[in-house]
Amino acid sequence: MEKIVGIVVAAGKSKRFGEDKLLINIKGMPIVYYSIRKLHDIKDIEKIILVVRNEMLEYYKEKIKDWKLEKVYKLVLGGEERQDSVYNALKSVDFHCDYVLIHDAARPFVSIKKIEELIKFCTENSLSAILGIPVKDTIKVVDNTTKRIMETLDRSKLWIIQTPQMFPFEIIKEAHKKAREENFVGTDDASLVERLGIPVYVIEGEPFNIKITTKDDLLWMEGILSKSELV
């Protein structure tokens, strides 16, 4: 059986939000709890590494016990950028691991069904894959100075990318190591693998698997929760 480690990235500074968005309560528990719990409840994920800010280390040590999240076996300090945080987690893996599944702590609404679908695809095909949804709106390239439209992109080939993202362990570790050596900063983990010429595939995700980034996202979240059972 393949050994899978989950990495939950909770080391962001929430600059755009104005407060620690991960601690905002949803039905009595903070956002971060649900993001970890989704991975925790999947039997194929053996262990979880939680990446946190230094000033939150003691808080999470206590809460992981309170929340009975036994699969969280290690807390790792984050870096300056998200990419640094993930690399710190990858370096901390101290046992044989076949795959790594990386998830943003600010995405509490991903379904267990979709995570399991992602795991099945990767392990059965020995491939890397990520969740994403097709773009529905028209996307244009705009000159930020003049605001002139430069190009209209073919949306039939465009996808909005989400997490979790899953990779064979040695591939994602090498991709992060290479990016660090070459001072390359990608917008997600998959972009680091892509630049090595290694294929990454997309599994269609769900529109409600949004990343809570601004107060507007919170309003959207509250509206959805009033009508559903996403957590």
Curated annotation (Swiss-Prot):
HAMAP family from the UniProt entry: IspD
Enzyme class: transferase
Molecular function via GO: 2-C-methyl-D-erythritol 4-phosphate cytidylyltransferase activity
Protein's name according to its UniProt entry: 2-C-methyl-D-erythritol 4-phosphate cytidylyltransferase
Keyword Endoplasmic reticulum among UniProt keywords: no
Pfam families reported in the protein's UniProt record: IspD (PF01128)
Species of provenance: Dictyoglomus thermophilum (strain ATCC 35947 / DSM 3960 / H-6-12)
PROSITE patterns: ISPD (PS01295)
Pathway: Isoprenoid biosynthesis; isopentenyl diphosphate biosynthesis via DXP pathway; isopentenyl diphosphate from 1-deoxy-D-xylulose 5-phosphate: step 2/6
Site (Positions MEP for the nucleophilic attack): 155, 211
Keyword DNA-binding among UniProt keywords: no
Keyword tags: Isoprene biosynthesis, Nucleotidyltransferase, Transferase
Residues the record marks as site: Transition state stabilizer: 16, 21
Catalyses which reaction(s): 2-C-methyl-D-erythritol 4-phosphate + CTP + H(+) = 4-CDP-2-C-methyl-D-erythritol + diphosphate
Lineage: Bacteria, Pseudomonadati, Dictyoglomota, Dictyoglomia, Dictyoglomales
